[in-house]
Amino acid sequence: MTQPIHILNGPNLNLLGTREPDVYGTLSLKEIEQACARHARDLGYEILFRQSNHEGELIDWLHDANVNACAVVFNPAAFTHTSVALHDAVRAIEPPVIEVHLSQTAAREAFRHHSYIALAARGSITGLGLQSYLLGINAAITSLGN
């Protein structure tokens, strides 16, 4: 059986649905997880969906994905703009990593315009709400063939 796609989520994403719905939408993280699971299953894949507010835990999960995932869809949230350590962890693993964001980070505050993760990821999908995740799953699967 194919290894699962790991979908990793960074800080404050546990507050989705109530935190700044004008920016992030009204879906909860649980609803995003359910939609991702259905979408991946329709494509013949399972997912492992996780969220942490702690940088080190996300790094550990990326290391784990190197052995236990076929691909990673990663929303590092605010760590996108600050974490060289997450950049290095993404570079250190073999499975393709697709960076995703619900909001269009390039259209927000200037400090959100730079992504350390994009420098290491296979690709990035931003600004499409839930579709960012679903397209991220598609891109991750497509990347497996390359």
UniProtKB/Swiss-Prot annotation:
Matching InterPro entries: DHquinase_II, DHquinase_II_CS, DHquinase_II_sf
Q: Which UniProt keywords apply?
A: Amino-acid biosynthesis, Aromatic amino acid biosynthesis, Lyase
Biological process annotations from GO: amino acid biosynthetic process; aromatic amino acid family biosynthetic process; chorismate biosynthetic process; quinate catabolic process
> Site positions for Transition state stabilizer, renumbered to this chain?
R19
Q: In which pathway does it act?
A: Metabolic intermediate biosynthesis; chorismate biosynthesis; chorismate from D-erythrose 4-phosphate and phosphoenolpyruvate: step 3/7
The EC number(s) attached to this protein equal 4.2.1.10
* Catalytic activity as recorded in UniProt: 3-dehydroquinate = 3-dehydroshikimate + H2O
Family affiliation:
Belongs to the type-II 3-dehydroquinase family.
Quaternary structure, per UniProt, is: Homododecamer.
Job of this protein:
Catalyzes a trans-dehydration via an enolate intermediate.
Which protein, by its recorded name, is this? 3-dehydroquinate dehydratase
Q: Which organism is it from?
A: Maricaulis maris (strain MCS10)
Coding gene? aroQ
